[in-house]
Amino acid sequence: AKSRSSRAGLQFPVGRVHRFLRKGNYAQRVGAGAPVYLAAVFEYLAAEILELAGNAAPDNKKTRIIPRHLQLAIRNDEELNKLLGGVTIAQGGVLPNIQAVLLPKKTAKSSK
């Protein structure tokens, strides 16, 4: 007995995705390939976000990924930010961003 996930070489559960597709009333019938493809898409997105968040963690001198790292990863990536534009991440905080007009004036005299 081999799971459909292992047949497809995936970590994400093909059977569970298939069940959700059936239970969700998205269509009358669900093809055999659809849940495999969708599980692969989910897995790719998860890997992409975790990769970026994993890079953000050491930058903040941490060894563990926290919601803040996920937030920074998503908001600093143009495509992920577009995809997850309407998503709020709990405990994510905001991107550091100060409008240019609010910054102190650069004067030629100040360079001592």
UniProtKB/Swiss-Prot annotation:
Q: Where in the cell is it found?
A: Nucleus; Chromosome
Q: Which UniProt keywords apply?
A: Chromosome, DNA-binding, Isopeptide bond, Methylation, Nucleosome core, Nucleus, Ubl conjugation
GO CC, sorted alphabetically, is: nucleosome; nucleus
Its predominant location is nucleus
Which residues constitute the cross-link Glycyl lysine isopeptide (Lys-Gly) (interchain with G-Cter in ubiquitin)? Answer: 106
Which family, according to the similarity comment? Belongs to the histone H2A family.
Question: Briefly, what is this protein's role?
Answer: Core component of nucleosome. Nucleosomes wrap and compact DNA into chromatin, limiting DNA accessibility to the cellular machineries which require DNA as a template. Histones thereby play a central role in transcription regulation, DNA repair, DNA replication and chromosomal stability. DNA accessibility is regulated via a complex set of post-translational modifications of histones, also called histone code, and nucleosome remodeling.
Q: Report quaternary structure and partners.
A: The nucleosome is a histone octamer containing two molecules each of H2A, H2B, H3 and H4 assembled in one H3-H4 heterotetramer and two H2A-H2B heterodimers. The octamer wraps approximately 147 bp of DNA.
Write the protein's name: Histone H2A, sperm
Source species of the chain: Lytechinus pictus (Painted sea urchin)
